[in-house]
Amino acid sequence: MRYKAVVEYEGTSFIGWQRQHGVVGKSVQESIERSIKEFCQQSVIVYAAGRTDAGVHATGQVVHFDLKVSREDYVIKNALNHYLRNEKVSILQLERVDEEFHARFSAKKRHYTYKISNREAPLCIDLMRMWHVPKRLNVENMREAASYIVGKHDFASFRAKDCQSKSSIKTVDSIDIIAAEEEININISAQSFLHKQVRITVGTFVECGMGLYPPAHVLEILEKKDRAAAGITAPAHGLYLTRVDY
């Protein structure tokens, strides 16, 4: 029986979503798999819609796994949350789904939010939940830069050097930059992204907002198809996987 769950986690506690052999620390995947084994004594593999990096948070990660036992959805959800009580992981929703459902390959769109604190004073409470950029950013310039990113492009300049994707061509469906007082939220959606594409995109927007180059320079970055041409990689702790559409 296949189950789908919506998961929330605080990413700074983990080495990322995926199990990594030879790396010190725990992954979100391992933590959930361990909770399932404690619940029903069954070893399973949990698959996720987004393989988030170390430090990246999630408020709407979607996973699936197969169980041999049959229980009410709420029983499984409550049991897993019980066994996850000492981890910074929470099962928000859980339901039985068709055997054809796959958390990663069935996904139609992934939604991320990047949170920036644009104030002069250092952060305390949100230190590992937002990127602190003390220099005042020109949000309108950032929005113009974003307009050049939306659509189908070769994003070779916006992917990590170790990205294993065969093609760097992706379609970004939408980018909304919302500024409220000292906080800037960048919402970006696509069916899929290259490794670190969102963080490199945000880093480029921030450099544009600082006045390091004009918004239209993003077009030159795209044309160069070279990681060195784009901006810095924004810190992981400002990024959230917020929703996955199916």
UniProtKB/Swiss-Prot annotation:
Alphabetical list of InterPro entries matching this protein: PsdUridine_synth_cat_dom_sf, PsdUridine_synth_TruA, PsdUridine_synth_TruA_a/b_dom, PsdUridine_synth_TruA_C, TruA/RsuA/RluB/E/F_N
Lineage: superkingdom: Bacteria
Alphabetized GO MF terms: RNA binding; tRNA pseudouridine(38-40) synthase activity
Active site, per annotation: D53 (nucleophile)
Keywords, alphabetical: Isomerase, tRNA processing
Residues annotated for substrate binding in this entry: Y112
Reaction catalyzed: uridine(38/39/40) in tRNA = pseudouridine(38/39/40) in tRNA
GO biological process, one term: tRNA pseudouridine synthesis
Keyword tRNA processing: yes
Entry EC number(s): 5.4.99.12
Residue ranges of coiled coil: none
Catalytic EC class: isomerase
Family: Belongs to the tRNA pseudouridine synthase TruA family.
Subunit text: Homodimer.
Function noted in UniProt: Formation of pseudouridine at positions 38, 39 and 40 in the anticodon stem and loop of transfer RNAs.
Full protein name: tRNA pseudouridine synthase A
Annotated source species: Anaplasma phagocytophilum (strain HZ)
Gene: truA
